[in-house]
């Protein structure tokens, strides 16, 4: 049985046998939709799911910037879902039985040095049509505008103001914000739209999303992740590079260069300033390192 059918049976079970509310079931539906999209992108059936794969998925949620509480909720939903599949003999063992939702702690965000970002961008040839142009635009938008990967895959032409160089983004909770595009990001996106997108689009198949796969379908979050990993490797970067690290780098580099924290909050679409303030810890850690390395009283004595 395929993922969609299993999801619907589970939701029916939650309603009919458990008596759970509509709101709770909708929350479960969203969690399972995200998880099953990831499974389908990797051609994983329910029988393929293991405890290490679920731990990998939990790390992915964290890397994509999901709040710790949301990660916990998602893993609670998955534990319940796989317990149900096991009870119905769809799977022989429950791979989620020992997976904990709260194992990922809130840490200082990982970032790339500006030089590493530049190296990856320079190694992605925008004149290589269509994939170089597409991938360069993806990298420029994630780093130049600080988009979430979920916002990037949904980006449409009607959200772009070319003249004023800004994007109209609908983020978490349906909130709209306006995000500036840097000159290089706007140039890369325009190059992709004008020179490459029509090569990827399928004739007679209208797709509103801007970023397309080789089959003319909208790129998924997992495919964006694969593209970024590939481009980082091609640039010779040894760091673990993933979509959300570009957003972290966007915010951190703005802060390092003197941007106001509340302006960064607005551009990131954070409802709470406290969420943005974690980037001040990145800057503080950097300054401590500089002091330790260069100040006469900061270095350890032999």
Residue ranges: model-predicted function:
Residues 1-302:
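Conserved catalytic core of the tyrosine transesterase superfamily
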